[in-house]
Curated annotation (Swiss-Prot):
Pathway participation: Polyol metabolism; myo-inositol degradation into acetyl-CoA; acetyl-CoA from myo-inositol: step 7/7
Protein name: Malonate-semialdehyde dehydrogenase
PANTHER family registered for this protein in UniProt: MALONATE-SEMIALDEHYDE DEHYDROGENASE
Binding site for NAD(+): 150, 152, 176, 179-180, 229, 251, 382
GO BP, one annotated term: thymine catabolic process
GO molecular function ontology, one term from the record: methylmalonate-semialdehyde dehydrogenase (acylating, NAD) activity
Keyword hit for Protease: no
Phylogenetic classification of the source organism: Bacteria, Bacillati, Bacillota, Bacilli, Bacillales
Top class in the EC scheme: oxidoreductase
CDD domains: ALDH_F6_MMSDH
Active-site residue list: 284 (nucleophile)
NCBIfam families associated with the record: MMSDH
EC number of the protein: 1.2.1.27
Keywords: NAD, Oxidoreductase
Length: 487
């Protein structure tokens, strides 16, 4: 049996062994094969990375903005040339099917493209005359060393929200990727190096609690970007703020989709199946709840079950597979416990994800509950799995009232052909990202990922103009010029 490779951290342009003696298996969730082992690093490792990044900041922050942008452009080109390899790594580590993995790679590349626009993004503003012979200018400067804490479910797209923009704007970066998806991160590092990135500008430290706390507490780290669960995100926001750091914390979701009587059912069902069960439901923009008007509910449920019956479950590398595994055994057990809870609390199980699934990996089939109420646990909690709850409602107003009861407010969608309903939905729903006749309202890189309520802690969101503000600080210069005498 071949020896399992132990991964190293990436600090100061080199792969270095962690100070730890603890390693965790990285497992292919579709096969349970151990791919490698990742270090559960220590605060010593973070100290080294932070000092390295702080030293690199002194020179990197002074590199001309067009030069930084050129390196990001080179990185984008290399990512594009290695799409298939990157997608393969996502599939074997995360479990997504190849099509979904390629889609994630594409979104990651879009984020890098946006960051490559740093020369225009870094521009400040000025006013030639604020008083007699006085002018003022507003300049942007990088903030310093930035820490990023990324999740397993989008191992390329989410880190590419973070470090490309931060680095393009003149910061240096320490990434703590998920310990479940490190091989993809290794490839990103390799390609970023080839793009011409200097040593110390980008660093990677694998780990768990000690690494997170090290990032939150280290005095050299000035800002933190986090994506993950609500409990951890709330902790990151509070503790990071206590240490006087700038923090953005993108957390949980319970996204509601509203289906009105006039919706095109074929398109609606296709979109909802993709939104609810794509990526095994392990995404913060997944459709978790459908509220459907009573007049169309029976027909909707029939078409939904018919569509779900055609879903192929299995290894994402296999042809035709739509639904891959959840990430780990614990996640599978947790999902099965929610199915039991839904039954106990009186919901009607119309598609049972416990049936006809392989034990070769951590598989849960598409699960649909009908007759769900807002008192039920499966409505309240973020399940983060291929589980969909359906609630029948009298009208749009009731559907919005139900959605607005949730503590989460990442996204919400509406399927209708009524323009007045669209406007009413837009003005009254409590959610930061809305979709009209589409299932996943995740915005492009040049718009903010704009969660509300318990889906986000902070002021400045990821992506868009918010990300430029998050990773920079401003300096306003006011200057008086004595009136010249050219006579």
């Amino acid at each position: 049996m071949a020896e399992i490779r132990k991964l190293k951290n990436y600090i100061n342009g080199e792969w270095v062994e962690s100070k730890t003696d603890q390693y965790e298996d990285v497992v292919n969730p579709a096969t349970k094969e151990v791919l490698c082992q990742v270090p559960i690093s220590t605060k010593e490792d973070i100290d080294y990375a932070a000092q390295t990044a702080a030293e690199a900041f002194e020179t990197w922050s002074k590199v001309a903005v067009p030069r930084r942008a050129r390196i990001l452009f080179n990185f984008q080109q290399l990512l594009s040339q290695h799409k298939e390899e990157l997608a393969h790594l996502i599939t074997i580590e995360n479990g997504k099917n190849t099509k979904e993995a390629l889609g994630e790679v594409g979104r990651g590349i879009e984020n890098v493209e946006f960051a490559a626009g740093a020369p225009s993004l870094m521009m400040g503003d000025s006013l030639a005359s604020i008083a007699t012979d006085v002018e003022a200018a507003n300049y942007r400067y990088p903030i310093g060393v930035v820490g990023g804490i990324a999740p397993f479910n989008f191992p390329m797209m989410v880190p590419c929200w973070m470090f490309p923009m931060a680095i393009a704007l003149g910061n240096t970066f320490i990434l703590k990727p998920s310990e479940r998806t490190p091989l993809l991160t290794e490839k990103l590092v390799e390609l970023f190096e080839k793009a011409g990135l200097p040593k110390g500008v980008f660093n990677v430290v694998y780990g768990a609690h000690d690494v997170v706390n090290g990032i939150l507490e280290h005095p050299e780290i000035k800002a933190i970007s986090f994506v993950g669960s609500k409990p951890v995100g709330e902790y990151v926001y509070k503790k990071g703020s206590e240490h006087l750091k700038r923090v953005q914390s993108l957390t949980g979701a319970k996204n509601h989709t509203i289906v009105l009587n006039d919706a095109n059912l074929e398109d609606t069902v296709t979109n909802i199946v993709g939104a609810a069960f794509g990526s095994a439901g392990e995404r913060c923009m997944a459709c978790a709840v459908v509220t459907v008007e009573e007049g169309i509910a029976d027909e909707f449920m029939a078409k939904l079950q018919e569509k779900v019956a055609d879903i192929k479950i299995g290894n994402g590398l296999d042809d035709g597979v739509f639904l891959g595994p959840v990430i780990r055994e614990d996640n599978k057990k947790r999902t099965l416990s929610y199915i039991e809870k839904g039954l106990e609390e009186g919901a009607r199980l119309v598609c049972d994800g416990r049936e006809n699934v392989s034990d070769d990996g951590y598989f849960v089939g598409p699960t649909i509950f009908d007759n769900v109420t807002t008192e039920m646990t499966i409505w309240k909690d973020e399940i983060f799995a291929p589980v969909l709850s359906v609630i029948r409602v009298k009208n749009l107003k009731e559907a919005i009232e139900i959605a607005n009861k949730s503590e989460f407010a990442n996204g919400a969608c509406l399927f209708t052909s009524n323009s007045n309903a669209i406007r009413y939905f837009r003005e009254n729903i409590d959610a930061g990202m809305l979709g009209i006749n589409l299932g996943v309202p995740a915005p492009m890189a040049f718009f903010p990922f704009s969660g509300w309520k318990s889906s986000f802690f902070g002021t400045l969101h990821a992506n868009g103009k918010d990300s430029v503000d998050f990773y920079t600080r401003k300096k306003v210069v006011t200057a008086r010029f004595p009136a010249p005498d050219f006579n």
